Amino acid sequence: MTKSNGEEPRMGSRMERFQQGVRKRTLLAKKKVQNITKEDVKSYLFRNAFVLLTVSAVIVGTILGFALRPYKMSYREVKYFSFPGELLMRMLQMLVLPLIISSLVTGMAALDSKASGKMGMRAVVYYMTTTIIAVVIGIIIVIIIHPGKGTKENMYREGKIVQVTAADAFLDLIRNMFPPNLVEACFKQFKTSYEKRSFKVPIQANETLLGAVINNVSEAMETLTRIREEMVPVPGSVNGVNALGLVVFSMCFGFVIGNMKEQGQALREFFDSLNEAIMRLVAVIMWYAPLGILFLIAGKILEMEDMGVIGGQLAMYTVTVIVGLLIHAVIVLPLLYFLVTRKNPWVFIGGLLQALITALGTSSSSATLPITFKCLEENNGVDKRITRFVLPVGATINMDGTALYEALAAIFIAQVNNFDLNFGQIITISITATAASIGAAGIPQAGLVTMVIVLTSVGLPTDDITLIIAVDWFLDRLRTTTNVLGDSLGAGIVEHLSRHELKNRDVEMGNSVIEENEMKKPYQLIAQDNEPEKPVADSETKM
């Protein structure tokens, strides 16, 4: 009884302190609202003009798209209508290649081998952790909601699936990491293709009755041959930037330049200037982004199939994917950021708003990369050495939304086929989806190819991917937004964990500058002795 009586005053004092804190915050908020002037409103609108315009573009684009759907525009008319959006995609994709190369080279060159190794390890651990969590969330959600009830016979199918073996896809990934021609890697990727070839297979004469007869007729013929057709892998290529190969080369090249000290200074300055020039171009393109996003979204809504073809199972599948992505993006990633940095994740995410909306509009994390750089460095103040190192790698291999979607979609296809997966098969799906999402950038046509690999790993029919293609255009945008959010929060986490290495590097750079100045000092003193009447200002003016 005594113990409980002692606890009551403590609880009362805590409640009083909490209430006082709430009152103080309320009064402060009221004062702030009362002190707001027209100038404050103008400055707020000016500072957040990009974000407000981009949000408005999404809203207007959605309304415009649905408003024009009753007019049943032809494919040609929709393409003409979407042209401003196509221009935005082309502008952003134009900057991706030089941005990835220059940012990675400068990022790696600015760090010593020890610091870059630690940062790389932290980034990889973060990527693996969030990807595995995303896969687990996808599996749990699809098992709980069970959207695949019923039969697949009445479900709408769309598109065709190209078959590919897991071994060839994995080998293509490794091949693309080491492109034989860097120029070709800027616009082509290696992809194994398949062609039908005929082989002559010998048949021993004594193995068949026919062989025995012929042997009796003509002893000169020892064997017969039959023609066998077989699909064999042959080297091929597809159009598209080999991002994985360029990332690997740029990281190695930057690492070597960083270790060259004074000899590599000219190259470091060149790539640093290139990176700065690209970011200035990004600043110009950002003003056009809202208009492009408006027409991209409106055009995609006009292209959309009739909503009537989407049955109950596909609608439930869509809801399941959205719930899984929301849990990962709204709960897991911000919580992980808070646990590591002890900072408010929503303030950080607020600075990323334009990058997230651009990802939603473009459906490409690579095309969004220039905007992501701008948001992280200018709005959130993330160190450039971190963004240049973490973001290009993250955009290439860290795809949480893709991993969640692939694991969830595989189990959904199993459900519509009434295929009961055991625990071992679910683990297989988890591992395959994780590996497939990490290597997606090195595999051409990543979405479909990686999905085929996941289904093949547990013996599910790959043709059933056509069941989910009808809604994939929409879910792909949500996956991309989740991927960009994961990359950006990862940059914030890696910066927090690497703050000591960055400070030490700053001190080393400061010491080297002092040493250089001290080495130059004797020459300045001699010049002063020879010409004592000339002030320092005159010499600076002449220069």
UniProtKB/Swiss-Prot annotation:
The gene is Slc1a3. The modification Phosphoserine is found at S512. The chain crosses the membrane at residues 48-68, 87-108, 123-145, 237-260, 270-297, 319-340, 386-412, 473-494. InterPro entries: DAACS, Na-dicarboxylate_symporter, Na-dicarboxylate_symporter_CS, Na:dicarbo_symporter_sf. Contains eight transmembrane regions plus two helical hairpins that dip into the membrane. These helical hairpin structures play an important role in the transport process. The first enters the membrane from the cytoplasmic side, the second one from the extracellular side. During the transport cycle, the regions involved in amino acid transport, and especially the helical hairpins, move vertically by about 15-18 Angstroms, alternating between exposure to the aqueous phase and reinsertion in the lipid bilayer. In contrast, the regions involved in trimerization do not move. Residues 522-543 are annotated as: Disordered. It is a multi-pass membrane protein. It is found in: Cell membrane. Residues 1-47, 109-122, 261-269, 341-345, 377-385, 495-543 are cytoplasmic. Glycosylated. Belongs to the dicarboxylate/amino acid:cation symporter (DAACS) (TC 2.A.23) family. SLC1A3 subfamily. This is Excitatory amino acid transporter 1. Na(+) 1 binds at G394, N398, N483, D487. Detected in brain and cerebellum. Both isoform GLAST-1 and GLAST-1A are expressed in bone and brain. In brain isoform GLAST-1 is highly enriched in the Purkinje cell layer in cerebellum. Residues 531-543 have a biased composition (Basic and acidic residues). The lineage of its organism: Eukaryota, Metazoa, Chordata, Craniata, Vertebrata.
